[in-house]
Amino acid sequence: MFRPKLLFTGLAALALGACSPQDRQAVTSAAIAKQVILPTYSRWVEADRQLAASALAFCQGTQELDAARADFLKAQRAWAELQPLLIGPLAEGNKAWSVQFWPDKKNLVGRQVEQLANAEQPVDAQSLAKASVVVQGLSAYEYILFDSKPEIADAARKARYCPLLSAIGERQKALAEEILASWNSADGMLAQMTKFPNQRYADSHEAIADLLRAQVTALDTLKKKLGAPMGRLSKGVAQPYQAEAWRSAQSMHSVRASLAAAQTVWVGVDDKGLRGLLPSEQKALADKIDAAYATSMKLLDDNDRNLGELLSSDAGKQFLNTLYDSLNVVHRLHEGELARALNIQLGFNANDGD
């Protein structure tokens, strides 16, 4: 009996099996762009829209401080998830610095926020866009909500900081919307990661290489975000104020969110991630990377202490060293064996020279 559906399925399977490596890379690039990157950018936009609304509500007295802080934490998490996906317009120029200023080795955030808050002319979103990136993003917003003394909920303090808080919320919303619109434009990143050749990529292999470079840079940055406060970059002297999001005690949560996003690029949705590009003879490498991610994620999931608490005890420091070493394994596997298996020359990453 003739079964056209089964025949079609069989032909499709044969066609898929006959796909060239280039075709598989094009499918993977498009899948990661549509199923991983674009949804993450969309969540970032929604979080920043809520942040802008939250700043306005808090400053108008219709939202409590705890709720304002919760909205900030959502925006912080959305940004952490985005960091392994920094390719295209957000990775160019100083746009990422405009979202979050880190590392801040000289407390520039605190000093410059106070200068703006004390200025005679109140800042607005338009003037903030022309100001230093130090005060445009989440680090400055975090300072106002978590570190300004006395409590920001005090009416007099609100009057002083609220113009800047509202301006940051609007600036972040506008920046996120601009980036997402650029991604979705006719010749934007979504199109460039889907159809080849184009102005950015001569072929799909270049797009996959760009994705891997972003992963390697992000994983290296995660190590730095742990290593700097641990003292690995300062002769063993702990530097807790060098941590990302230390004021809100969210450093460990941000590390986990970023690592989970990197793992999603590796695994993909419906197995259409970088992992799926490895041939069957590279199963041992795929298993090794799976295990490395699993080790790091378990360490993070089993931990319920913030970074400051971990740095204050010998047991906590040992845990951080174990976590750092596990992240190093993930990073080195991507930088070395995975890059070679995919025939990708990485060159320098964005952290080289830091």
Where are these regions (language model features)?
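Bacterial N-terminal signal peptides that target proteins for export
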Residues: 1-8
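C-terminal motif of bacterial Sec signal peptides marking the signal peptidase cleavage site
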Residues: 16-18
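Mature extracytoplasmic or organellar-lumen-exposed domains after removal of signal/transit peptides
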Residues: 23-354
